[in-house]
Regions:
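Long, well-ordered alpha/beta core segments of mature domains
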Residues: 1-207
Length: 207
């Protein structure tokens, strides 16, 4: 008989009698911070980062999410930690430029890096679309000590159809991987289509 939920983060505990200890396999993440969003957006606009750099960084940060067990994703900013910061699909060379700038903005604005990464993606979309993109803060920053490098290695993408990326040693059809990942991200077919076409219209592609 199932007496508890053992999938996902600690926030999914239910009831008053939950354990207090923090377990690394639950991918612990500290609470987020309150900050002035408009001030942070102003700093992002002055950062000199390109729209493409901000969008790709925000996307890669979120792309590791798995709806099956709620691992990965933008919350925690683990794209700045090992192993994700070294994944080929995350463009380590680009991250080496982008992350220090976003970390400085996070420190100056009192925000988490996780929130600033997402907010920068929003700012870039607003720049190219002229539309306002809703933003909800509250993400926290995990530490390297809170990250199980070995287990996170299994989240490394072998392909990202949204960015037209596929490892050379992968024989699976990329369109099949695209559909599988879209399902893990919880995307509908229209949402998947809009994302792929939106990235292409902005010239965002690994090729």
């Amino acid at each position: 008989k199932l007496l508890h939920r053992d999938m996902g983060p600690k926030t999914r505990y239910m009831g008053p009698e939950v354990p207090e200890e923090e377990l690394i396999w639950q991918d612990p993440i500290p609470e987020g911070k309150s900050f002035e969003v408009d001030s942070a957006k102003s700093l992002i606009l002055k950062s000199g980062l390109t729209n493409r750099e901000m969008i790709e960084t925000a996307w890669c940060s979120a792309f590791s999410f798995r709806g099956s067990d709620l691992r990965g994703g933008a919350n925690g900013a683990r794209i700045a930690l090992e192993p994700q910061v070294s994944w080929e699909s995350n463009k380590p060379g680009q991250l080496a430029k982008v992350l220090p700038i976003l970390k400085e903005i996070a420190a100056e604005s009192g925000a988490s890096l996780a929130d600033i990464i997402v907010l920068a993606g929003n700012v870039a979309i607003e720049n190219v679309s002229g539309m306002t993109v809703p933003f909800t803060p509250g993400r926290g920053d995990a530490s390297q000590e809170q990250t199980d490098v070995d287990s996170f290695a299994y989240l490394e993408p072998i392909a990202d159809g949204f960015l037209n990326y596929k490892r050379d040693d992968v024989d699976i059809k990329p369109e099949e991987i695209l559909l599988d990942k879209s399902h893990l991200l919880g995307l509908t077919a229209p949402e998947m289509t809009v994302l792929v076409s939106g990235f292409r219209s902005l010239g965002i592609s690994t090729d």
